[in-house]
A protein has these predicted regions:
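Active-site and donor-binding regions of nucleotide-sugar-utilizing enzymes
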Residues: 5-140, 275-276
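Well-ordered, non-membrane alpha-helical segments in soluble/globular domains
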Residues: 18, 68-75, 205-217, 304-307
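Donor nucleotide-activated moiety binding/catalytic core segment of transferases
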Residues: 231-277, 281
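A nucleotide-sugar donor-handling region in carbohydrate enzymes
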Residues: 111, 117-119, 123-195
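Short loop/turn segments at strand-loop or loop-helix junctions that form parts
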Residues: 60-62, 89-92, 107-115, 190-200, ...
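Conserved catalytic-core segment of nucleotide-activated headgroup transferases in glycan assembly
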Residues: 191-231
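Leloir-type glycosyltransferase catalytic cores
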Residues: 236, 300-326
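Short, charged/polar "capping" segments at the starts of alpha-helices
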Residues: 37-46, 95-96, 117, 201-203, ...
Length: 326
């Protein structure tokens, strides 16, 4: 019997892998899970993974010597089998080698946050996927193929224009929605849930703090601040000391936290995060808004990524939160 293979490296990728299992009614599922050095990230992965029905889990842990030889060993093992579906969460090095070396019927890219938009624009839209970093060439020396001939299809909750080169299957987050229990939900009408940013988004913490203060003053509601798992320590410490903020650190993605604790958030705000999109899909009556980061306070290396995100927010009619000066 053919297997289905999932190569995942983040909590959100595993959530979306589970949605794919449900949508395509898949059995005989193998997970290759790639960990990194961030403890919160890895804890979230394990907490989600234990609730996923899998037939085999292969874990790749961080190593001082790198992951190259571990990748080689795992790819050689995976080559022994045939696959119906191959699901990948990104176009990283292991996936660029797995795709051309495994026998499978179809390849799907599942969402890894806003990064899916970048992958689509930079690689998939124009079939521009065979661009390699030098490190990929090492696999050639060991007899692996690196040229991708497969179509990389999408299982996604993002709304992309129809493309004749790829199949786009809509991920409606059905599994998450089905877990909502409206009769026992706790409605948080008097609080604002603010979702934090990763380390590379905002470079001026004082402006970041000012946005929180203006949000508090403008809305006259307590702010429950949920940090991003990659938030820098100095940002975390700054927010913790604000008297109008309740700091709430999670060991699971915010979508899972709300559902597992029967929380129905009535008001969610952030500067930039995929969770605004997923929460908008799950909680129809919630107010989901974003505060736009100005160019002068963001990391310029990712400014185009931020612009693409805000353009997509506008496309799906996500509301912008405008704050009066105080």
């Amino acid at each position: 019997m053919k297997k289905n293979l999932f190569v995942v490296a983040s909590p959100l990728q595993i959530i979306n892998a589970n949605e794919a299992i449900n949508y395509f009614s898949l059995i005989n599922n193998v997970f290759v899970v790639i960990y990194n050095s961030n403890d919160i990230h890895n804890i979230q992965i394990d907490n989600i993974l234990k609730n996923i029905k899998t037939d085999e889990v292969i874990k790749i842990k961080p190593s001082r010597n790198g992951k190259f030889f571990e990748y080689v060993k795992i790819i050689r093992y995976l080559k022994k089998y045939l696959y119906n579906y191959l699901f990948i969460g990104d176009m990283g090095s292991i996936n660029r080698v797995i795709i051309p070396n495994l026998k499978k019927d179809k390849v799907f890219l599942i969402d890894d946050g806003i990064g899916t938009i970048d992958y689509y624009n930079n690689f998939l839209k124009n079939s521009n996927i065979n661009k390699y970093k030098f490190s990929i060439l090492r696999f050639l020396l060991l007899g692996f193929k690196i040229n991708i001939k497969d179509s990389i299809n999408l299982f996604t909750y993002f709304d992309f224009n129809k493309n004749n080169n790829i199949e786009i299957v809509k991920n409606n987050l059905t599994c998450l929605k089905n877990r909502l229990n409206s009769s026992s939900n706790n409605f948080y009408d008097d609080d604002i849930f603010f979702l934090g940013q990763p380390f590379d988004a905002c470079k001026k913490l004082e402006e970041y703090k000012d946005d929180l203060h203006r949000l508090y003053k403008n809305k006259n509601k307590k702010i429950i601040y949920i940090p991003h798992r990659y938030e820098p320590k100095e940002q975390t410490e700054l927010i913790k000391n604000l008297e109008y903020v309740e700091f709430l650190k999670l060991n699971e993605p915010v979508e899972m936290f709300f559902i597992n604790n029967n929380i129905y958030p009535k008001y969610v705000v952030s500067h930039i995060t995929t969770a605004l999109i997923t929460l908008k899909m799950i909680y129809n009556s919630s107010k989901i808004e974003y505060i736009k980061l100005e160019k002068n306070i963001v990391n310029q290396e990712i400014y185009n990524h931020i612009l693409n995100t805000y353009e997509y927010y506008e496309k799906i009619s996500l509301e912008q939160c405008f704050l009066d000066k105080i």
